[in-house]
C-alpha cells in the first residue's frame, strides 16, 4: 500500500492584512510593528524556508516549502495546512510526528511572536488546546489495507463513505482517504475544508464549556447564601477577570460569522468539493446555527457576570461603609478621652503618667480597630439572589 501524503492543520482568525504581514516576514524577516529584529531573524531561520509563493485559490494564500520536506499553506482567513509527502507505511507515525513537531516548535512560535501585539488570539483566551485531525492519503489501497490502518490508529470508526473516486474512513483523530482517481488538488481542498470545520466547531465547543464553568462557579458562591468579608475582594477580582475574558472572547465570536459565507461560497462553486462535503454529511447551515446559538448564550453569560459583579460591588461598599463607621467610633472615643483628660488639669504637664496614659490610649484604639477588622472579615454577608420564575403565565 502506498501512502502518498499526511496532513495536519489549524485555524486562527486572520484577514488578508495579516496574510501580507506573514508574507513580508517569510520573505524578508520584516515587520512594520515594534518587534525585535533579532528575534524575527531567529524565528524565520528556524522555519528552514525553501521556496515561497503567493497565490489565490478561492482565497489568497502563502505557500512555502521547507528543508525538512514539509510544505505549508496559510490562507487569508487564518487556515493553516501542513503536509509531508515523504511518508511511508512503515514510518507513518514518525512522519506525522515530524509534521506536528514542525507546526508546534517552528511555525507556531514564529506566528505567535509576529502577532504578539494587540488582543490575544481566541485559542489563548479560551485555553484551547490543539487536538489535530490527522489526514492520511493512500493511493488505490484495498479495503483490507484501509481497515488495517484504522485498527493501528483508532479504537472506533465514526463513519465511512465511498464512491468511484475515493473512500474516506473517519475515526476520532484520523481521516483515512483512499484516492482512486481523484486529483491531489481536489483531495487537498477537501482536507482544507474539513480542518476549517473541525477547528471552527472546536472553538465554539470550548466557548460553550466556558459558559458552563463560569455559570457554575457563580452559582456556587450564591448557593452559600453568605460570604465572609475577607473573601469579598477575592470574589470581585475573580468576577472582573471573568468579565474581561468574556468581553474579549465576545469580540472573537462576533468575528467568526464573517468567515462562513466566504468558505461556503467557494465550496459550493466547486461541484466535486460540494459533493465531497455532501457525502460526509456536512452543512454550512448547521455551522451558522451553532454559531448563532453560542452568540445568544454568550450574551446571557455576559449579563449574568455583570449582575454578579454589581451584587458583590454592593456588598463591598457595605463592608467599606461599616469599616469607616467603626474607625470613626474608635477615633471619636480616643478624642473624647483626650479632651476629658485636658479638663482634669489646669494646664498640661509632661509626666511619666501622661506618657503611659497616651500609650495605653493608643494601644486601646489600635486594639479596638484590630478587633473590629477581625469581626468585619469574619462577618458573613448575605448573597441574595432572585429565584427563577418557573410558572410564568
Q: PLM ranges: what are they?
A:
Residues 1-120, 368, 385-393:
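N-terminal pre-transmembrane cytosolic regions of membrane proteins
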Residues 11-20, 37, 117-125, 223-235, ...:
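Ampipathic, surface-exposed secondary-structure segments
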Residues 26, 30, 44-47, 56, ...:
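Hydrophobic, Leu/Ile/Phe/Ala-enriched alpha-helical segments that form helix-helix packing faces
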Residues 34-50, 134, 139-144, 265-267, ...:
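Generic detector of short, locally flexible boundary/turn motifs and exposed helical patches
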Amino acid at each position: 500500500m502506498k501512502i502518498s501524503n499526511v496532513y495536519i492543520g489549524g485555524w486562527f482568525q486572520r484577514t488578508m492584512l495579516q496574510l501580507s504581514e506573514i508574507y513580508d516576514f517569510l520573505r524578508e524577516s520584516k515587520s512594520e510593528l515594534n518587534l525585535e529584529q533579532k528575534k524575527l531573524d531567529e524565528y524565520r531561520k528556524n522555519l528552514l524556508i525553501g521556496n515561497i509563493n503567493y497565490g489565490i485559490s478561492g482565497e489568497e494564500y502563502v505557500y512555502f516549502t521547507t528543508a525538512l520536506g514539509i510544505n505549508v499553506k496559510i490562507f487569508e482567513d487564518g487556515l493553516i495546512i501542513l503536509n509531508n509527502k515523504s511518508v511511508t507505511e512503515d514510518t507513518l507515525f514518525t512522519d506525522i510526528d515530524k509534521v506536528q513537531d514542525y507546526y508546534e516548535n517552528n511555525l507556531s512560535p514564529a506566528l505567535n511572536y509576529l502577532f504578539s501585539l494587540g488582543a490575544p488570539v481566541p485559542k489563548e483566551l479560551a485555553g484551547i488546546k490543539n487536538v489535530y485531525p490527522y489526514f492520511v492519503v493512500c493511493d488505490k489501497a484495498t479495503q483490507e489495507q484501509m481497515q488495517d490502518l484504522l485498527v493501528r490508529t483508532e479504537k472506533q470508526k465514526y463513519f465511512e463513505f465511498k464512491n468511484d473516486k475515493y473512500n474516506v474512513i473517519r475515526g476520532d483523530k484520523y481521516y483515512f482517504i483512499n484516492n482512486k482517481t481523484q486529483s491531489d488538488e481536489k483531495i487537498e481542498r477537501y482536507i482544507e475544508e474539513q480542518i476549517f470545520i473541525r477547528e471552527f466547531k472546536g472553538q465554539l465547543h470550548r466557548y460553550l464549556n466556558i459558559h458552563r464553568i463560569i455559570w457554575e462557579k457563580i452559582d456556587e458562591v450564591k448557593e452559600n447564601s453568605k460570604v465572609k468579608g475577607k473573601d469579598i475582594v477575592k470574589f470581585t477580582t475573580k468576577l472582573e477577570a471573568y468579565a474581561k475574558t468574556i468581553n474579549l472572547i465576545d469580540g472573537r465570536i462576533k468575528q467568526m460569522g464573517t468567515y462562513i459565507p466566504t468558505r461556503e461560497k467557494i465550496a459550493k462553486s466547486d461541484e466535486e468539493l460540494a459533493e465531497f462535503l455532501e457525502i460526509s454529511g456536512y452543512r454550512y447551515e448547521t455551522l451558522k446555527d451553532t454559531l448563532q446559538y453560542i452568540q445568544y448564550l454568550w450574551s446571557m453569560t455576559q449579563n449574568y457576570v455583570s449582575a454578579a459583579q454589581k451584587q458583590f460591588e454592593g456588598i463591598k461598599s457595605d463592608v467599606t461603609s461599616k469599616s469607616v463607621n467603626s474607625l470613626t467610633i474608635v477615633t471619636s472615643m480616643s478624642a473624647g478621652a483626650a479632651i476629658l483628660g485636658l479638663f482634669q488639669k489646669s494646664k498640661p504637664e509632661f509626666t511619666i503618667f501622661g506618657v503611659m496614659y497616651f500609650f495605653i490610649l493608643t494601644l486601646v484604639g489600635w486594639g479596638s480597630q484590630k478587633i473590629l477588622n477581625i469581626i468585619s472579615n469574619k462577618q458573613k454577608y448575605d448573597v441574595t439572589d432572585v429565584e427563577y420564575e418557573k410558572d410564568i403565565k
